[in-house]
Amino acid sequence: MKRVLISVSNKEGIIPFARKLVHLGIEIISTGGTATLLREAEIDVMEVSELTGFPECLEGRVKTLHPVVHGGILADRSKDSHMKTLEELKIKPIDLVVINLYPFKETIQKKNVTLEEAIENIDIGGPTMLRAAAKNYRHVTVITNPEDYHAVLEEIEAKGNTEETTRYELAKKVFQHTSQYDTLIAGYLGKDELVFPEQLTVTYEKVQDLRYGENPHQKGAFYREIGCEEGTLASAKQLQGKELSFNNINDANGALALLKEFQEPTVVAVKHTNPCGVASAKNIDEAWDKAYAADPTSVFGGIIAANQVIDAETATKLLEVFLEVVIAPGYTPEALVLFKQKKNLRVLELSSILAEPKGQMDMKKVLGGLLIQEYNTGLIGNLKTVTEKEPTTEEIEDLLFAYKVVKHTKSNGIVVVRNQQTLAIGPGQTSRIWALENAIGNCIHPLEGSVLASDAFFPFKDCVEVGAKAGIKSIIQPGGSMRDQESIDACNERGMAMVFAGVRHFKH
């Protein structure tokens, strides 16, 4: 290895790396700010403009886009014709390319960044050189991440060059990196448009490998959507406990999505992504009491999410139950000390717990493809009473509460509520009446004076009849069935109120 080209925006570790290369007798070529930095560190360096005989121009937009640079990178050393051309054109081979790109991601994450600022941080020459070096990996080593400096130096020191297997792995990293870079740019430029493009490319960054996937025989990992981390598990801080599992993250996400529906102090308990206890109250301690009382059996081994700081009083109660995860915007110091009694309990802090994520698309993988839709951010359309009896103010509050919960319950879903507390939840049934019967059958509370929410319309009046026998007084459903009038008449005959929400909330 004789020659390296270095041009980096991330200067981490570059000085000791370059100094070692010089010690190994490798000539350094560099550009602009990187060359200045290396010279200040008393490292010998040749400017790219000296190599090409052509100055940097257009305020630095054109630095390395030159045949002398790309010929030196792309020449296939195994072909005599390529090497003869280099000799005729007096082009020197470049054996190592060290580049990281303009910080486009960091730029667009700044508050109030302008389009002009973002555009100026779109790298052109960098990706071109990276791709050229990666294409010619049989002869050229390419580095785009400072984490690879040490391993590459070790190989050069030991063998005078890198192994082809190493160059191949580094080349793969380059194409992943440049693909992600271009996807970020395309996403940013189209961020104000909700469109379904003819070709879709998405980019995520790995947060962590997981012990396994949904089941022990499946491998798994967790990735974050770049630029959409605020208010999501990707930005949560784990304060204690075992490593998060695939199912922990999936269930915690379900709890978090439901919690975002509420502004008042609320606790959400989730099991297998379905809510099993939800309650609002004047404070988090009381909300937990109500959420736990809703279904103390199902909450065992569940996920708890709260939208206010958890104090010692609430923490003491949480410790009485076996829980997998607790997530909240914060904890008092006393609460954190108490949680240490259960070292395996995963305690997550998410200060922006009520912030709405910036991502616009909801995606579901299917065999051979991907389903994409807008996020379900609405709750109701025009709330309309369709029965002779009007619901009371208190009943309307409970109806809306129940509709928020059923929106996040697997279809067919039924939720029964009284006083801002779930009493019965029937999720994921293939028949709506079965969902109601399941909810009532597993309920430990009297249902007199409660309200019922259904995620979709009643195809028959049977849910009204069964609900009335259980003591339910008011119902909220989207409406839209050809048999709506049968359900309305059944309510009128029983003195019940029914409102149409105008918006369906299937969840699969």
From Swiss-Prot:
Its EC number is 2.1.2.3, 3.5.4.10. Residues 1-144 form the MGS-like domain. GO terms for cellular component: cytosol. Pathway: Purine metabolism; IMP biosynthesis via de novo pathway; 5-formamido-1-(5-phospho-D-ribosyl)imidazole-4-carboxamide from 5-amino-1-(5-phospho-D-ribosyl)imidazole-4-carboxamide (10-formyl THF route): step 1/1; Purine metabolism; IMP biosynthesis via de novo pathway; IMP from 5-formamido-1-(5-phospho-D-ribosyl)imidazole-4-carboxamide: step 1/1. SMART domains: AICARFT_IMPCHas, MGS. It comes from the Bacteria. Keywords: Hydrolase, Multifunctional enzyme, Purine biosynthesis, Transferase. The keyword Transferase applies. One of its GO terms (biological process) is 'de novo' IMP biosynthetic process. PROSITE patterns: MGS. One of its GO terms (molecular function) is IMP cyclohydrolase activity. It catalyses: (6R)-10-formyltetrahydrofolate + 5-amino-1-(5-phospho-beta-D-ribosyl)imidazole-4-carboxamide = 5-formamido-1-(5-phospho-D-ribosyl)imidazole-4-carboxamide + (6S)-5,6,7,8-tetrahydrofolate; IMP + H2O = 5-formamido-1-(5-phospho-D-ribosyl)imidazole-4-carboxamide. Signal peptide: none annotated. The IMP cyclohydrolase activity resides in the N-terminal region. NCBIfam families: PRK00881.1, purH. Belongs to the PurH family. This is Bifunctional purine biosynthesis protein PurH.
